[in-house]
Amino acid sequence: MFQSKAQVRLVEHLLQNRQKVFNQAGLARVLDVSPSTVARIAEPLVKSKILLFERYEKGMKIFAFNQEEPAARSLVEFYEKISGL
């Protein structure tokens, strides 16, 4: 399902912070990758609707975990199960 370690770290960060909204630069800092890497690893998650994406003023890219998507809810359930181990 996930294409790289960076993408796994992105999903884990989003699962840990499900209620928050992030910009691309902030995610890049947290994940210690370039903003272009964030864009690349986020694209399949946006296409699968796990991640919501909007472009705001002057091109700022905003991301949020899509808690309404069934696949995203399944990820939350799985994450909560393995976190409890």
Language-model segments: residues:
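Short helix-capping/hinge SLiMs at alpha-helix to coil transitions
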Residues: 15-19
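A short acidic, leucine-rich amphipathic alpha-helix
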Residues: 26-28
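Key DNA-contact positions within bacterial/archaeal DNA-binding proteins
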Residues: 35-36
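Glycine-centered, phosphate/nucleic-acid-interacting loop/turn motifs that mediate DNA/RNA or nucleotide
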Residues: 49
